[in-house]
From Swiss-Prot:
Signal found in the keyword field: no
Gene3D superfamilies reported for this sequence: Sodium/glucose cotransporter
Signal peptide: none
Reaction catalysis annotation: D-mannose(out) + n Na(+)(out) = D-mannose(in) + n Na(+)(in)
Record-linked PANTHER family: SODIUM_GLUCOSE COTRANSPORTER 4, SOLUTE CARRIER FAMILY 5
Family affiliation: Belongs to the sodium:solute symporter (SSF) (TC 2.A.21) family.
GO MF, any single term: symporter activity
Protein name, entry field: Sodium/glucose cotransporter 4
Localization per Swiss-Prot or TrEMBL: Cell membrane
Amino acid sequence: MNTELVAMEPGVSRNGVRTETTTNPSLGLHTYDIVVVVIYFVFVLAVGIWSSIRASRGTVGGYFLAGRSMTWWPIGASLMSSNVGSGLFIGLAGTGAAGGLAVGGFEWNATFLLLALGWIFVPVYIAAGVVTMPQYLKKRFGGQRIQVYMSVLSLILYIFTKISTDIFSGALFIQMALGWNLYLSTVILLVVTAVYTIAGGLTAVIYTDALQTVIMVGGALVLMFLGFQEVGWYPGLQQLYRQAIPNTTVPNTTCHLPRPDAFHMLRDPVNGDIPWPGLIFGLTVLATWCWCTDQVIVQRSLAAKNLSHAKGGSVLGGYLKILPMFFIVMPGMISRALYPDEVACVDPDICQRVCGARVGCSNIAYPKLVMALMPVGLRGLMIAVIMAALMSSLTSIFNSSSTLFAIDVWQRFRRQASEQELMVVGRLFVVFLVVISILWIPIIQSSNSGQLFDYIQSITSYLAPPITALFLLAIFCKRVNEPGAFWGLMFGLVVGILRMILEFSYSAPACGEMDRRPAVLKDFHYLYFALLLCGLTAIIIVVISFFTEPIPDDKLARLTWWTRNCAVSDLQKKTSVSVNNTEDDNSPGLAGRPVVEGPAGDEEEANTTQGPEQPGALHRSWGKWLWNWFCGLSGAPQQALSPAEKAVLEQKLTSIEEEPLWRRVCNINAIILLAINIFLWGYFA
């Protein structure tokens, strides 16, 4: 459908809805808004300090796995808030404004994988007795090259994708809503976030995540109801969204028109912007990596008291992941329906004036709706919501990155590192991440805001599928060995990088430009590519494994789905010890200390290291005392457990037994959750 350049009366769109034409309105915060934001920060710091004081922070397990003491509800809330960062509020609402409901499938797909995490992956991880995902691969396959590759790859992804996305999105909202200085506001957020992450470890992170989840869901639901009230609820949204055309368009193009399939989840497999086979199958590959093998997510479930609490956390997280479709995607569509001249702009000059990006301004959909619809006081609440999303995701990344660095990287260089050294190194690495995050701000500012989220998605589709294939085969196929796993990963990495080079060599065309990209890019969706890459990597892993020597069955005890319930006999213990002692890449920082092997750090263990103050302790300076508390260092000497005590503790920490009642409760709730999710897919398909 061709249109001509149209200039209508300012402030009136084609659908007759009044729109605001000011690009950067100077909206001063009311006193009530400021009070709400201050109360939010006070609550977060109070919860962080409270959880830091009560936490077991002086051991690897206490700091990195919350002492294996978390119950189901903070785990479920933390799973939600760790994933729903400020980037999701900005990016998901923006994609919904541009393309409709289909992007909500990314959230609903997570429900299935969260249940897979609790019922399939976590039992194996707990039985294996691991703290990090690279550590599991090392136990499963032996050798060190896979562990080091996975650790470094994860850290690179965290620093240059997750952290940068969240900071960019939070900065975009703060700039538009508050007019604060970008650097000052971001530095304050990062410093407050880092302080309770460093001080309290995973316990502080999970409890503050739980608080922020309540704030996020509550504030977002308020905005959702106000938005639906403004457009006439769902029927009104359907009508107004289809008419949401900006006043100024590019001649002879259809870029400005809303998609005709905007209210359908399942779209054409060839011409759809999110084809349905890719949404169901290709996305599952990426989601498996995100929810079942990514350290940020899995670490929360590994902190559970027992397997039933881990399953309960997955169920709660699955229910919470149903909500973003309604309080993020649909408000994004409402924003386009109400303010098409800004949110749906297509003329590059107008877009540059509105949001500073010539390719489009869909990213401002959510903050635009907040500033236009929320009344005094509630506007401050929504600012707190975005800050909560930003800080909760950053704390998760900081804590998980410090875990990976201390356990999987630092111990490669310091094989005899003491437990206290690991605690200090993990905390100092968080400081390093904060510095990198601040230095990354100018790069984010100069980046094209319209391409940043495409960049994040493409990075995932290029690098995640081989990891998904490896973990699935590691857990379900005992025949897979280390050579097959390593060379399969290398093959997947090379193919993914080749696609990445093509992607960034040929940028997507702007509205009105001819698409000159090769067919492998413009006609082969990245979700299809993810599915293909996962399949090819799996084939390479299996073929090489079958042509090389298999791993003996006695070395796979409690490391696969089929051997997760194997009793830890004396023979298996000796085998495990001999493997660790003969491997060149042994990690004495974990295995060499009796209380830290596997998911170390139970509350009982913490008590053995938190002894009474020494007689000379009263003469220590307050500064030294504060430093020792901050770093989780105890003045008392560590007490080594006897072999019998160690065996009892290790058996407790690696137990996947469940009480029959709670196992049935979890199973019933999982079935109900699946039924609700499948109904929603069918209703919006």
